[in-house]
């Protein structure tokens, strides 16, 4: 038993639990259709008041459906807020009711086909999406024929609520397995021919494999694929889709890629199934989760354990747009070229744009890893520069140390702003680079300042870079002065 469940419940736990139980009791007195409609009204209120969550949902919908008009995006977000609360409230109520009442609200049209696909399965791994009323996942033992059932879940901070969730699911024959305790019990269920379910469509952090979801790389849990391969389990993917007020349909399909398919291939295919399910009813998915979360500090992906997997049939990736503010002097710009090249090669979807003084624009266009160059004309102030780059980039990386460079990207509202801590500009940045350690008896070479940035954000510093093509065919003699007033 975990340490958490050995702890005593606090007064706050008791108060929250009392409110939850009271609300559940009052809702249980109402018809489920009324609860659904009332939940939609509460959800609309949340849409109006919860501006940060509305922005997050809007951003996610725009990533998934970049061709949608703004009005279509907003309609999807509004409907999502409404149906999300409606489904959650109905899930609370139906979770307390007997199966003979609950099944009146479920469409079983596809269950027969699912049963045929899994009849001879040794065991089953069910990859569940946050679609519709996912709380009805606990009903699996009532319509699937397996000796045991388990679900991997994240424990509640409130000890009393956590115990209530466990008891409610066990009442239906579903064992709740806290994922922080490991998967020994889940593996045991599979070994005994059971079914193990888990939610699969959330950001998996550093432990996930980066595969496309709607054409944009997303960290995705490979756990369902790993368990299915090791246990020789049949893999199902799906959820409980909303098809009307207080009405849901079971949609689970067999994922058959063959025994030879790799973990990465299976994980990628799971994301494709998630896409297909979302496209059937876009407002039904959980858009309030930061599914395409940018990792920190290593938002370049070359050094992650599981790395990136791109299926051979995948569409072109949506670009991960990186703005790099170049130094203003030619010598400094030359010394930063290697860092720019390594940053570009840090992830397959990287699109690098250099923000430079106009006098350096032609120089940066000769670097093959640079996709675009934006020039800063003489006399342009920070507000004018910010207008040029506003809403166009996910990341801004600052090579110069001046406060103005921080102000430019802050005014442009670029989400991630990266650079060294320097006087008068720390307020404008939200990711800081540690100073490089001195190399040997003298101070580090100035190029190391830029390479340290690339290293800290996840670039591969060991990769051999291809040679840059010659700019001109005729031989020339170039003289370099390897020094500066402030260092080598």
Task: Give the label of every model feature segment.
Residues 108, 176, 211-213, 292, ...:
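Short clusters of hydrophobic/aromatic residues that line enzyme substrate/ligand-binding pockets
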Residues 148, 175, 195, 232-234, ...:
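Residue-level detector of anion-binding/catalytic polar loops
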Residues 122-128, 149, 194-198, 233, ...:
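Generic beta-sheet signal
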Residues 122-180, 203-209, 216, 361:
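Catalytic core of membrane glycerolipid acyltransferases/transacylases, capturing the structured
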Residues 51-54, 71, 85-87, 116, ...:
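Catalytic machinery of carbohydrate-active enzymes
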Residues 2-4, 8-11, 75-78, 118-119, ...:
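Non-catalytic C-terminal accessory region of glycerolipid acyltransferases
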Residues 2-128, 133, 162-167, 173, ...:
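Membrane-anchoring hydrophobic helices of lipid-metabolizing enzymes
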Residues 85-108, 150-180, 354-383:
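Membrane-interfacial amphipathic helices and adjacent loop/beta segments
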């Amino acid at each position: 038993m975990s340490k958490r469940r050995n702890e005593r419940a606090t007064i706050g736990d008791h108060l929250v639990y009392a409110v939850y139980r009271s609300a559940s009791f009052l809702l249980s007195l109402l018809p489920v259709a009324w609860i659904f409609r009332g939940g939609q009204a509460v959800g609309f209120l949340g849409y109006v008041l919860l501006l940060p969550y509305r922005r997050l949902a809007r951003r996610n919908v725009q990533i998934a459906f970049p061709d949608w008009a703004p009005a279509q995006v907003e309609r999807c977000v509004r409907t999502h807020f409404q149906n999300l609360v409606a489904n959650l409230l109905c899930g609370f109520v139906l979770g307390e009711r007997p199966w003979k009442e609950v099944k009146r609200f479920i469409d079983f049209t596809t269950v027969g086909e699912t049963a045929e696909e899994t009849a001879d399965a040794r065991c089953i791994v069910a990859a569940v999406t946050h679609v519709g009323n996912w709380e009805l996942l606990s009903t699996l033992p009532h319509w699937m024929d397996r000796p045991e059932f388990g679900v991997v879940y994240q424990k509640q901070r409130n000890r009393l609520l956590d115990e209530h969730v466990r008891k409610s699911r066990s009442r239906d024959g579903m064992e709740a397995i806290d994922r922080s305790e490991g998967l020994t019990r889940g593996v045991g269920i599979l070994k005994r021919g059971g079914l193990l379910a888990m939610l699969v469509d959330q950001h998996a952090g550093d432990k996930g494999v980066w595969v496309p979801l709607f054409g944009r790389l997303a960290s995705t849990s490979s756990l369902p694929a790993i368990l299915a391969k090791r246990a020789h389990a049949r893999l199902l993917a799906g959820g409980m889709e909303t098809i009307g007020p207080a009405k849901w349909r079971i949609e689970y399909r067999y994922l058959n890629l063959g025994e030879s398919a790799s973990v990465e291939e299976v994980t990628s295919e799971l994301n494709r199934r998630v896409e297909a399910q979302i496209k059937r009813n876009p407002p039904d998915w959980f858009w309030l989760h930061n599914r395409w979360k940018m990792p920190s500090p290593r938002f370049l992906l070359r050094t992650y354990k599981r790395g990136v997997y791109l299926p051979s049939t995948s569409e072109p990736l949506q670009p991960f747009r990186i703005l790099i503010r170049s130094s203003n002097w030619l010598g400094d710009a030359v010394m930063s070229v290697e860092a720019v090249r390594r940053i570009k090669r840090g992830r397959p979807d990287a699109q690098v744009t250099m923000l430079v003084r106009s006098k350096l624009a032609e120089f940066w266009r000769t670097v093959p890893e640079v996709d675009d160059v934006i020039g800063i004309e003489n006399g342009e102030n920070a507000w004018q520069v910010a207008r040029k780059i506003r809403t166009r980039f996910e990341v801004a990386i600052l090579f110069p140390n001046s406060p103005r460079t921080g102000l430019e990207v802050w005014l442009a509202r670029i989400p991630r702003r990266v650079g060294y801590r320097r006087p008068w500009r720390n307020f404008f940045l939200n990711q800081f680079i540690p100073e490089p350690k001195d190399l040997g008896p003298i101070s580090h070479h100035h190029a190391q300042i830029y390479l340290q940035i690339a290293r800290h954000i996840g670039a591969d510093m060991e990769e051999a870079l291809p040679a840059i093509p010659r700019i001109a065919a005729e031989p020339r003699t170039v003289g370099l002065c390897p020094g500066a007033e402030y260092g080598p």
